[in-house]
């Protein structure tokens, strides 16, 4: 099960990397730790959860909005999805913000 060294939630984006399939999922949240946890407890992206449940290994990276160079979570998320090809070659179903 995931364990987090961080104990304080923050606004930002998170990158879930499926090491077994070389696929990314990028999401955003005002409380990033809660959003990350949702994906591994069946309350987030169903495909991510299914792969995790059946044994795929994941790594997690989180980027705080503060000092990221972006003004909004939407901008940071869109940029991160594009950077990791999470829409074209990953789990993301949109290019960001449900667009």
Language model features with spans:
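Short, solvent-exposed coil/turn linker segments
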Residues: 1-2, 53-54, 64, 85-86
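Coupling/hinge elements of helicase-like and P-loop NTPase modules
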Residues: 84-99
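Serine endopeptidase catalytic core focused on the charge-relay Asp
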Residues: 80-81
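Conserved short loop/helix modules at catalytic or binding sites
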Residues: 30-75
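GIY-YIG nuclease catalytic motif and its immediate N-terminal context
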Residues: 1-34, 38, 71, 75
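Generic serine detector
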Residues: 3-5, 20, 57-59, 68, ...
